Amino acid sequence: MDKLIIGGVEIKNRLFVGSGKYPSNEIIKDVLEGSGSQVITLALRRVDLDNKEEDILQNIPKDVILLPNTSGATNAEEAIRIARIARAMGCGNWIKIEVISDSKYLLPDNEETIKATKVLADEGFIVLPYMCPDLYAGRRLIEAGAAAVMPLGAPIGSNRGLKTKELIQIMIDELDIPIIVDAGIGKPSQAMEAMEMGAAACLVNTAIASSEDPINMARAFKMAVEGGRLAYEAKMGRESKFGNASSPLTGFLD
């Protein structure tokens, strides 16, 4: 069984979760327990060290890895600045690069993301860039020092599933780096599909947070990710366009 190692840390639970859109900060601790997630993303604006009641960190156990994102950045320079602030605030050296200047579809800017990744990786950050799935951009992100890459399945927050499935599959097949499917996954079955494809992990936020029961939805996603990974490692049987009986069709009545 392959291990998932990012930044020298073994990640045993391949479901990453986000921290936005929940009805309250207090529920996040229960979602983390239900999902078993070791990694949680958070926007820096939700960290308030001067007001513990509003500070999201008060609801995240100390053994969970913080993955601050650069939400709000529209270019590489802004993303770099946000990342440095996050580390200075004590959020660690993991960073999810988000560079988005498109306000309609919220698609990440791969070129600016590559620039930010290079600078931050050189500064010792563990960089996980959010990106539009593209093989060439993935290769350049690896060259820039990315620890993993996070291609979107569909526009962020859309719950539409794996609309970019074929492009993600190419990246999984061709890149020697963890591929974490991020954005657009709306159902546990879609997370399972991503894992069956060979994705290293999935990051899910909106599908859990917007459900009627986020805690049980987190549990459902945990099982789906585990099942999908197990199926991938078990090497699924080949598809056939013809029927293939599982029992002999001749000889019984002879």
Swiss-Prot record:
Record GO cellular component, one term: cytoplasm
Principal location: cytoplasm
Catalysed reactions, semicolon-separated: [ThiS sulfur-carrier protein]-C-terminal-Gly-aminoethanethioate + 2-iminoacetate + 1-deoxy-D-xylulose 5-phosphate = [ThiS sulfur-carrier protein]-C-terminal Gly-Gly + 2-[(2R,5Z)-2-carboxy-4-methylthiazol-5(2H)-ylidene]ethyl phosphate + 2 H2O + H(+)
Top EC class, one word: transferase
Any GO MF annotation of the entry: thiazole synthase activity
Record localization: Cytoplasm
Active site: K96 (schiff-base intermediate with dxp)
Disulfide bonds: none
CDD domains listed in its UniProt record: ThiG
Biological processes, Gene Ontology terms: thiamine diphosphate biosynthetic process
Keyword tags: Cytoplasm, Schiff base, Thiamine biosynthesis, Transferase
The keyword Cytoplasm belongs to this UniProt entry's keyword annotation: yes
Residues that, per the record, bind 1-deoxy-D-xylulose 5-phosphate: G157, A183, G184, N205, T206
Pfam family, one: ThiG
UniProt pathway annotation: Cofactor biosynthesis; thiamine diphosphate biosynthesis
EC number: 2.8.1.10
Record text on subunit structure and interactions: Homotetramer. Forms heterodimers with either ThiH or ThiS.
Function: Catalyzes the rearrangement of 1-deoxy-D-xylulose 5-phosphate (DXP) to produce the thiazole phosphate moiety of thiamine. Sulfur is provided by the thiocarboxylate moiety of the carrier protein ThiS. In vitro, sulfur can be provided by H(2)S.
Family note: Belongs to the ThiG family.
Protein name as catalogued: Thiazole synthase
Organism: Clostridium perfringens (strain SM101 / Type A)
